[in-house]
């Protein structure tokens, strides 16, 4: 603490360089987070979900860490299988991939970790060959990425959803136009076995030439049908703008089948509307959408017909400042929350302002983020944390999981070590 006070004096009197100032404020942020300890969310805002917001605690844990200059773990998301862990606890399955940092978005096949004691212990990351790369005769590698796992109670299976991706033999993505599709894989907990990943067949190969459900939260309805947010572009479309929709699908425990899709939401601003995430709250469906310039939201009564999209803004009228990255939902029985990154948090040194991770309550009628409820869930340590997941684990816990993407290299002295974090929100 004494050294921090000395540093504060040096900040005030201009004796520190820019990098030292950045590190100083990160130290302050981390200490503030630790001292806060238990994060509480309460407000008397009369518009806040028409009820008092729930108190909650946040327990921040490191699941695993890895950084060797070649890869870090990324796209870490977790799903809960009820009742088959120790003493009736759920079994947690975390899916993640290696990001080979020499290339942009260059990911391994899928790995999984497992916990039967609510995260007290985890198995080591296990490569799953059925979820790995497939090598074609033309030296092209086809993989799957941006996976979100979830439990399908009617069939007793875990379903992992994402999309396909193409890589060069020597590394890196193939950027020329190729068909992309929603990919899925099935885990049978009784056999402790993954089936080989498959691709969802769409009704129009031309229209949905470049489509997928990357990084999105999806829903299982009471009748077992799935609502899967997806984004797409037609073949030969050079607009650099995706459209988003919600796919209505059936699942028999082995095969995922398209049935219909809702309104197609478009926006003629690079790169359109993509990486949508879906949730349901009090019988209404909420969709948050990524755009390069700002984030958008819309609502529906049937997941087919949607209100006009609107930018995400705080209840004070200012835009929340989330851009060119995803947002996700956290749902309490009495309250709807948004998890996001944003600019304006002393984080200009982070590409796309992709850290820290914030959570705040949402007014579900006005579609506003309640600024006074905003909290930092996972502090930033100089690197990006954009590819995160939010999962309902039990009625009492929701988890936000993310791996530190060790980029940019000039910030690697600011505390990041390739940790995969789990922020346990305890309601």
Regions found by a protein language model. Name each.
Residues 75-77, 146-148, 215-217, 275-277, ...:
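Conserved beta-strand position repeated once per blade in WD40 beta-propeller domains
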Residues 20-22, 27, 118:
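Charged/polar low-complexity intrinsically disordered segments
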Residues 24-37:
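Bacterial N-terminal signal peptides
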Residues 7, 33-36, 46:
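Low-complexity, intrinsically disordered segments with a bias for serine/threonine
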Residues 42-72, 80-142, 151-211, 219-275, ...:
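Beta-rich carbohydrate-recognition and catalytic domains
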Residues 390-394:
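Short glycine/proline-rich, acidic loop/turn segments that cap or connect secondary-structure elements
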Residues 1-21:
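N-terminal secretory signal peptides that target proteins for export/translocation
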């Amino acid at each position: 603490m004494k050294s921090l006070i000395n540093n504060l004096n040096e900040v005030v009197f201009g004796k520190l360089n820019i990098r030292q100032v950045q590190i100083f404020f990160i130290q302050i942020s981390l200490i503030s987070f630790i001292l806060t300890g238990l994060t509480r969310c309460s407000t008397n805002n009369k518009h806040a979900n028409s009820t008092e917001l729930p108190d909650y605690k946040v327990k921040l844990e490191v699941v695993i860490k890895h950084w060797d200059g070649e890869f870090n773990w990324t796209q870490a998301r977790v799903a809960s299988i009820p009742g088959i862990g120790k003493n009736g606890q759920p079994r947690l399955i975390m899916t993640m991939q290696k990001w080979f940092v020499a290339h942009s978005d260059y990911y391994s096949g899928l790995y999984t970790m497992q916990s039967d004691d609510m995260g007290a212990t985890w198995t080591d990351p296990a490569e799953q060959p059925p979820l790995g790369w497939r090598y074609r005769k033309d030296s092209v590698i086809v993989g799957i990425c941006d996976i979100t796992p979830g439990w399908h109670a009617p069939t007793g299976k875990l379903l992992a959803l994402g999309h396909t991706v193409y890589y060069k033999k020597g590394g890196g993505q193939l950027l020329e136009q190729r068909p992309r599709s929603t990919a899925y894989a099935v885990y049978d907990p009784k056999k402790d076995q993954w089936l080989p990943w498959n691709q969802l067949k769409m009704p129009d190969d031309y229209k949905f030439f470049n489509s997928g459900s990357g990084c999105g939260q999806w829903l299982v309805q009471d009748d077992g049908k799935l609502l899967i947010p997806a984004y797409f572009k037609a073949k030969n479309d050079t607009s650099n703008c995706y459209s988003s929709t919600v796919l209505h699908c059936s699942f028999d425990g082995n095969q995922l089948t398209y049935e219909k899709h809702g309104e197609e939401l478009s926006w003629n601003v690079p790169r359109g509307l993509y990486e949508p995430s879906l949730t349901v709250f009090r019988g209404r469906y909420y969709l948050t959408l990524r755009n390069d310039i700002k984030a958008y939201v819309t609502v529906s009564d049937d997941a087919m017909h949607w209100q006009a999209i609107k930018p995400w803004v705080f209840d004070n009228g200012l835009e929340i400042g989330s851009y060119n990255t995803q947002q996700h939902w956290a749902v309490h029985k009495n309250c709807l929350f948004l998890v996001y990154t944003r600019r304006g948090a002393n984080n200009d040194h982070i590409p796309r302002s992709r850290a820290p991770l914030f959570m705040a309550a949402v007014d579900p009628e006005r579609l506003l983020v309640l600024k006074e409820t905003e909290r930092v869930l996972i502090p930033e340590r100089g690197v990006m944390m954009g590819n995160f997941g939010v999962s309902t684990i039990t009625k009492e816990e929701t988890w936000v999981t993310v791996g530190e993407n060790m980029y940019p290299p000039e910030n690697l002295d600011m505390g990041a070590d390739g940790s995969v974090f789990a922020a346990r929100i305890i309601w």
